[in-house]
Structure formats: C-alpha cells, structure tokens
C-alpha cells in the first residue's frame, strides 16, 4: 500500500534535524515549523515541504520597545477589595502581581485613566480624594470606615504574558523578558509594516507566515510567585491604552471609564452579561484591529507568501465567527486542540482556505519529564479530537 503524504505539520529545532527528517518520512508530513524559543535549522531550508515561520507582531524586538516606551502595550488591572479601618486607606496597587510583568502607567494622567471605587456603595471616589505615590507604589485615599475600596489602574506590559508563560513553564534561565509593543500606535504601526517586509526579505525560504497572533493578548495575569492569577481567553482588558481609548471616545461620543473593562473585578468574563459600553468597545476594537491585520496580510501576499493566523495568544479583535474576520484575507487558521470543542471551534471557521489543529501535548517539561507519560496525553487528546470530527 502506497503511503500518503500531506496535511501534517511538524515542529523542529536546531538539534533535532535527523529526527525531523525521520518523522517527515514516517508521518508523511508536508510542512515544517519553528516554535517560540526555537530556531529553524538551515539544513531543512531545502526540505521537500512547506516551511512555516512563527511571526510575532508585538514582541521579539526589545530595542524598539525600549526606545519607544510610550508605545508599550497596556492593560487594566484592579486591586483586591480593601476594607477601610479608619478615614484613610492605603492600597498597594501591585500587591499580588508579578513585578517584572507589569508597571503602573504614570506617564499618562492617572486622574483621568485610573479609578478608585467605593465598592460598598458603588460610587466613584472623587479624584481630589486620592493620590498615588510612585515611591511607595500606593494609593492613599479618604475613606469611610468599614467600606470596601478598589483601585483600577493602567499598567504597561513589560513582559509579554505568553513569553512569560513559556519561560516559566520551560524553566528558561536568564532569558530576556520580551516587552509587548502596541502596533495600533502611530510610530510602532509604521515601524511594524517595515519590519514585516524586512523579515520576509531576510527569509526567502519561508512559504507561510504563521502570525502568533496579531496585536492584543487575551487577559493573562500572573501573581507574585509567577503563577497564573487570572486567565480569560476572550478577555479584552489587555487591549487598552489612552491612545486607543481616546479614539474610541471620539467614535461613540461618551467618556470611557476603567469600570467598563474592570466590571467589578469580573473583567467581563464570558459568564457575565456585557454592558452596552463594553459591547461598543469590543465592536470598535474588532473594526480597528481588522484594518491593520488586512494591511499585514496584504503585504504578506504581495511578497508571495501565505498568511496563517494562530487562534489564541494575541488574537483579541480577530474572533473568527464575527463579521470582521471575513475581511482579513487570511489563507489559514491554526489552533491548539485542547479538546473536542476547541477542535470544532477551529474546523468550523469559514473564510479561509484551510484550518489546522495543533495536537497536544506541548514539548514542555510539565509532560516530558522523568515519570511523565506524553503518549497517554497524546492518545487521550487524539481520541477526544476524533470524537469531535465524527
């Protein structure tokens, strides 16, 4: 019986070239890709396969981010609830958060973009009743004894959450923290288009650009011990900046409040009924993200390459089942098959030439370790995916 070939993509790295070639033959793979933290081997550039290159639009360029700190991406974060025991309350805004990941934004007007709320009454504390000290990292406010208070603040994303997750999970030592820059802002937008063209020019052997992903990370926050503190795959709280919010205000005709994102600390998770303001913001984000994605996809096609999107990571604003997705012009979507429902989420996408499921487990030490059983996990993942296909 003749062995078939095609519709299988395999990952590679510099030190596994013979194994990559062996698996290509064994599995009939027709595509090879690099991964976060790996490099594509020169020996495989002429392999009989399509070559995918993972492309990061918002990170892996700290020189640019550090030279343009005002265009680093930001997110809204809320402190825990604190009970006032007297008429003065101090709130340490970064308490319980990983210090290397976030940095409070004091560059922009904090009295405009931050918000202190009396959660007992639901009232906003007037801006003349509180102050922030950069030296102590604390907000000091005039309080009503035994009322509960929170501070909602903007913070720069100084360590990309996905890069941090990969570094922590793989125990990467002495790795430079990749800063997340904001492609929506003018200087970075212009630079990004030039950077994309240069990347394609420098990698002529690449057939498919695997955008991972585009501009805004889903909500992913780590605690002070580098553990996942809050995760929402659909969260928009890391898609904000005064630049973006001022554009939004011009479109909708009303002032933006931090609470539209914070939502009493629920961050508008998928179990909440969204407010009109939050829905307005999501619609605005999808439209604005779609414009720049289309620009990047057009450049990719102009240079003779295919454009593939990873379903996840910085995917906010590119949700495949919304109207704007059809305007992006993507060739393909790839996603991680966590279970049957995520497989169907990927396979049912319209408006692309093909979809691709990345089967688990990751080649990470949480599975690939002494006593681990990656075969068991792989088999379970495959059986679950097959059930969804059938």
PLM features per residue range, with description:
Residues 1-390:
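Glycan-processing catalytic domains of CAZymes
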């Amino acid at each position: 019986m003749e062995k078939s070939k095609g519709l299988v993509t395999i990952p590679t790295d510099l030190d596994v070239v013979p194994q990559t070639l062996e698996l290509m033959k064994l599995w009939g793979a027709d595509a090879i890709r690099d991964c976060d933290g790996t490099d594509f081997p020169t020996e495989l550039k002429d392999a009989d396969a399509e070559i995918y290159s993972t492309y990061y639009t918002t990170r892996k360029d700290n020189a640019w981010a550090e030279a343009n700190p005002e265009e680093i991406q930001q997110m809204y974060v809320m402190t825990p609830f604190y009970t006032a025991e007297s008429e003065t309350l101090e709130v340490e805004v970064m308490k319980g958060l990983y210090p290397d990941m976030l940095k409070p934004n004091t560059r922009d007007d904090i009295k405009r973009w931050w918000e202190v709320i009396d959660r007992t009454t639901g009232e906003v504390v007037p801006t003349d009743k509180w102050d922030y000290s950069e030296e102590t990292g604390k907000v000091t406010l005039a309080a009503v004894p035994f009322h509960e208070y929170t501070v909602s603040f903007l913070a720069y994303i100084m360590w990309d959450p996905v890069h941090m997750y990969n570094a922590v999970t793989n125990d990467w030592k002495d790795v430079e923290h990749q800063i997340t820059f904001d492609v929506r802002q003018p200087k970075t937008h212009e630079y990004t288009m030039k950077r994309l063209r240069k990347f394609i020019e420098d990698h002529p052997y690449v057939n498919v650009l695997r955008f991972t992903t585009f501009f805004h990370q889903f909500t992913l926050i780590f605690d002070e011990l580098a553990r996942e503190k809050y995760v929402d795959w659909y969260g928009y709280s890391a898609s904000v900046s005064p630049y973006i919010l001022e554009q939004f205000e011009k479109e909708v005709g009303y002032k933006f409040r931090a609470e539209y994102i914070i939502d009493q600390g629920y961050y508008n998770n998928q179990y909440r009924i969204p407010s009109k303001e939050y829905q307005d913001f999501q619609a605005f984000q999808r439209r604005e993200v779609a414009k720049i994605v289309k620009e990047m996809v057009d450049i990719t096609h102009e240079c003779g390459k295919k454009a593939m999107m990873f379903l996840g990571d910085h995917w906010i604003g590119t949700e495949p089942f919304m109207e704007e997705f059809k305007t992006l012009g993507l060739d393909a979507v790839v996603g991680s098959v966590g279970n049957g429902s995520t497989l169907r989420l990927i396979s049912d996408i319209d408006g692309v030439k093909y979809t691709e499921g990345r089967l688990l487990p990751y080649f990470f030490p949480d599975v690939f370790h002494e006593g681990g059983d990656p075969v068991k996990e792989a088999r379970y993942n495959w059986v679950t995916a097959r059930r969804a296909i059938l």
